[in-house]
Regions:
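Extracytoplasmic/secretory soluble proteins
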Residues: 4, 9, 13, 17, ...
Length: 518
């Protein structure tokens, strides 16, 4: 690590003799950023973090906002056309960067004590970061953002259930898929929301919210997503990559959810509904169970308190299979592809300095994450950060506050473990409820996961080429089976069809990745 940092320093000193392209006075950089669905600020530029950054650095930024639902497609068009912003912040992914490295600026020469003292200090304290952001050609094209680690982030989407409705109907908390079926039937017929209408939706989901994908409803059958790819169609056991979509338990899971759908217990519109429609369903107070970050994201305090984590259900027809839910203990929670400067930028050194300045201290980072001090956070005389919990309403929840005042993990800084905010003794119950939900299911996180490391661009392209059509087919097959059912003939045809989509080659790619063959 020290030798690597020394190399960066030597290279930067040598290149400092070369004149950098200069920007005209008063010219602004353009950064493409993520626009979160819970943000009610009216625009990134209205927030204290960006304002403070401009005041302290003198560097003006124009923020070009994309909503997460359409960002991927729009960024692909930008990359293909060459019509690029100066940088991307928290909105570009590994594939988009690695497959287009010539469009991005190698940052090595700008990472030195003079230009980026805060980043250099961070790399010295956490040398593993350098390995994580260094591509196979030896260059650093992206800088890490978000929370380095966070106990709340060990879990991903959690399955929630309205415990108050169970109590009202005299129902026990289900522990198996068959018990869950019976509970959902009772909810469908029992009018637990008390409006006199049969409008209850026992289970909903959406494919347009990272926390609420259908595939994770197959958790009782040992199948769930994992960060880094696969969408639940791949898992790892004893170091071996396994294709899940041809397993007998995969079929059993689809048959179970078709039964639920056929009886009106599963909201099949989840396969097509938007994130906004999903949130509207939740706010209608008709949903009994769904996947999400925390009920406080979707409800005012009184209704949010009715929900609790649904225990990881055991498949009644596969009792030997360990139920799983997405998550990983002590994982790195940051985004290694968080900040990427493009070749369109006339002065990369200035943008690196701007980014570095946002990593100066915990308070500066909190301005970006949570907004101005005194609303969602405060700093004591010892420099420690404490979370604040202002009163929320149904229309402006704490989650709205987070994305309206700040931007959470979509920020130009990496919050280190020692900088994370803590809750005081006077914090409300909801302050620790997310961690409680994670703790309730953490024993069911997959035992093995795909390791995260950088690979050559051509291997990323190979993986994507193999997976694009396969994923489209599998997503369609899953939706069709849940909505219309699955018989032996359909399953046998599926087993043949997946080979036509080169499923075995896709799985072998991951096996070679695990075995470090490239």
């Amino acid at each position: 690590m020290k030798r690597f940092l020394s190399l960066i320093l030597v290279l930067s000193l040598a290149l400092s003799l070369i004149a950098l392209p200069a920007m005209a006075e008063g010219e602004a950089f353009t950064i493409t950023v993520n626009l979160h669905g819970l943000d009610k600020s009216g625009g990134t530029a209205n927030k204290i973090g960006p304002k403070h950054a401009e005041e302290t650095t003198g560097i003006k930024i124009n923020y070009y906002e994309l909503d997460s639902a359409s960002a991927g497609e729009k960024i692909n068009i930008m990359l293909a056309s060459g019509d690029l912003p100066d940088a991307f912040l928290s909105i570009i992914n590994e594939t988009q960067v690695v497959s287009n490295l010539p469009l991005f600026v190698p940052l090595n020469e700008y990472l030195n004590e003079e230009n980026a003292p805060n980043l250099m200090k961070m790399f010295e304290k956490y040398p593993e970061l350098v390995d994580m952001i260094t591509q196979v050609d030896g260059n650093i094209y992206t800088l890490p953002i978000g929370d380095f680690s966070n106990p709340d982030n060990q879990g991903e989407g959690i399955q929630f259930i309205n415990k108050a409705w169970l109590d009202k109907l005299g129902l026990e908390m289900p522990t198996t898929t068959e018990e869950f079926y019976e509970v959902c039937k009772a909810i469908k017929e029992g009018d637990p929301n008390g409006n006199g209408e049969a409008d209850e939706i026992p289970v909903t989901f959406t494919q347009n919210n990272w926390a609420a994908h259908f595939i994770n409803l197959l958790g009782p059958y040992g199948i769930c997503e994992w960060e880094g790819g696969g969408d639940g169609y791949l898992k790892v056991e004893d170091g071996k990559a396994i294709f899940t979509a041809t397993l007998p338990e995969f079929r059993a899971g689809l048959e179970y959810w078709h039964r639920m759908a056929a009886e009106g217990l599963l909201d099949v519109e989840g396969f097509t509904q938007t994130n906004e429609q999903f949130y509207a369903r939740l706010k209608s107070y008709s949903v009994a169970s769904y996947r999400g970050w925390t009920p406080a994201s979707n409800f005012a305090a009184e209704q949010a308190a009715e929900f609790t984590a649904l225990p990881a259900l055991q498949a009644s027809d596969y009792p030997e299979i360990q139920s799983v839910t997405p998550g990983e203990i002590n994982r790195f929670c940051g985004n290694c592809y968080g900040f990427a400067i493009t070749r369109a930028c006339k002065d990369p050194a200035a943008l690196v300095r701007w980014f570095d300045a946002q990593n100066a201290d915990a308070a500066t980072k909190m301005l970006w994450k949570y907004g101005e001090e005194g609303k969602l956070w405060k700093q004591d005389e010892n420099g420690k950060i404490w979370a604040l919990w202002p009163e929320q309403t149904e229309d402006f929840t704490r989650e709205n506050m987070k994305y309206t005042y700040g931007a959470m993990n979509h920020i130009p800084c990496l919050i280190l473990p020692e900088e994370l905010e803590e809750n005081g003794d006077d914090a409300p119950v909801e302050a620790t409820v997310r961690l409680g939900f994670v703790n309730a299911v953490k024993d069911h996180f997959p035992a093995e996961r795909i390791p995260i490391r950088n690979v050559p661009a051509e291997k990323i392209q190979e993986r994507n080429m193999l997976y694009t059509d396969l994923k489209a087919y599998l997503d369609s097959f899953v939706a069709d089976c849940v909505v219309n059912g699955l018989d032996d003939a359909k399953w046998e045809k599926h087993l043949k069809d997946v080979e036509g989509y080169r499923a075995s080659e896709w799985v072998q790619w991951y096996q070679d990745y695990i075995d470090k063959k490239f």
